[in-house]
């Protein structure tokens, strides 16, 4: 999420301004962050949509026809959530691009059956609200208390003007959470 914000200077400025009222000398106003920072929330959901590459496992409880395939009772079905998050019918034609406004323009997307960053059913993450609040407070402190920007150095993984290139995600494996960048691709 930090990388997506840092690589877009307009978004960086917008997030800094949006979270500013939540950062107080004695701490964070979490209520403000959760209820008044719609751009931050949209960035959070979009980052989760693009980087969450885990699986959901369900047991087939009765014979079920899926397309032309019969799933027998007792078998397990494994579903990669990243495929749900790449549904063009739900998320639009630019599914592989980070769109910081995707969930701002369509708040209903966060409740879509194709958006499962925290699992679902009995495996719905009980810590999802806490995790979101921790991430929001980290972002608020990071961008409010310090003037953070990308380093400009020549070398590998840099553009011709010395800017760091966006980290490439390691999409080669399913994870238990967020996809890591390829080795050497950290921000």
PLM regions with names:
Residues 1-21, 78, 127, 135:
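Central I-helix of cytochrome P450 enzymes
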Residues 11, 128-174:
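Cytochrome P450 heme-binding "Cys pocket" and the immediately downstream C-terminal segment
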Residues 21-69, 109:
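Conserved cytochrome P450 K-helix E-x-x-R motif and the immediately C-terminal K′/meander segment
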Residues 79-107:
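Conserved cytochrome P450 K-helix/beta-meander segment immediately N-terminal to the heme-binding cysteine loop
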Residues 106-117:
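Active-site-adjacent bridging/hinge elements
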Residues 168, 172-187:
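C-terminal helix/juxtamembrane-tail motif
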């Amino acid at each position: 999420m930090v990388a997506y914000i840092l690589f877009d200077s307009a978004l960086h400025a917008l997030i800094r301004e949006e979270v500013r009222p939540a950062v107080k000398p004695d701490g964070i106003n979490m209520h403000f962050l959760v209820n008044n920072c719609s751009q931050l929330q949209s960035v959070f959901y979009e980052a989760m949509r693009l980087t969450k590459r885990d699986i959901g496992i369900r047991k087939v409880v009765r014979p079920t026809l899926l397309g032309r395939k019969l799933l027998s009772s007792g078998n397990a079905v494994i579903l990669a959530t990243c495929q749900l998050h790449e549904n063009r019918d739900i998320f639009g034609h630019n599914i592989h691009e980070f769109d910081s406004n995707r969930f701002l323009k369509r708040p209903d997307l966060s409740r879509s059956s194709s958006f499962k960053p925290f699992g679902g059913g009995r495996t719905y993450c009980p810590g999802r609200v806490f995790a979101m609040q921790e991430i929001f407070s980290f972002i608020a402190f990071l961008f409010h208390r310090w003037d953070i920007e990308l380093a400009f150095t020549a070398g590998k993984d840099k553009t011709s003007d010395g800017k760091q290139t966006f980290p490439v995600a390691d999409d080669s494996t399913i994870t238990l959470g967020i996809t890591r960048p390829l080795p050497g691709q950290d921000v």
